[in-house]
Amino acid sequence: MNQILEKPENKKWDTKMPGKLTVSIGEYSDKGRKEINQDFHGSYYPEEPLLSSKGIALAIADGINNSYISQIASETSVAGFLDDYYDTSKSSAVKRSAEQVLIATNSWLHAQSQKTHGHPDNDKDYVCTFSSLILKSTTAHILHIGDTRIYRFRAGKLEQLTTDHCLRVSDEISYLNRGLGIYSILDIDYQTTPMKLDDVFFMTTDGVYEHVSNDFIIDTIEEHIDDLDLAAELLVEQAYQVGSSDSLTAQLVKIDELP
């Protein structure tokens, strides 16, 4: 359910073209101990001229646990973003294009949830977290709502780049206070960061990062840097083995060459 775009079997693009951004991507997702996978993820690696004008996009979303239809929100958010972002004007800035798409998605999700309010089924909210990484030229653009996370692994160090939008009541209980579909007005975190050769960006959901240590993440990336699909699978497997009860998703993207 999570593979929304056709890609080569190993999802690794390694054709070296001088002067062009070149990356390797690895992805893995599993429903874990859930009945269904409430996570959704995807990526799109376009050819020219879109590669230069719009960049490479990855997105990840996690539907809220207390809604049995939130997987629709996560799938709609990721699939819609990867489709609609590339339909925006080629001359429009990344921030404007991406926010335009997310605002429209938020409005649709919020409207669907409002239709169900007042009915006996109060567990039918179209709400999810969402994080996107857009790699264009030598800059990484990050858009983020909720508690999915984006990390950067550089020179042996792992750094969390996003902030969790949740209210933590205890070690076991937290509440999402920002997400797609919660409110009619969307508040998006946006930032940019320069990329360096061999940077690895790690995108994941709480089903993974709450159960896997930073040291394990670092060791897994370093050991399997040439097979990021395997690295992503091992991160998910480790989270499951130590007791994660949530859906689990991991995405990795390595910067192989910069313009």
Spans of model-derived segments:
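PP2C/PPM-type serine/threonine phosphatase catalytic domain
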Residues: 1-259
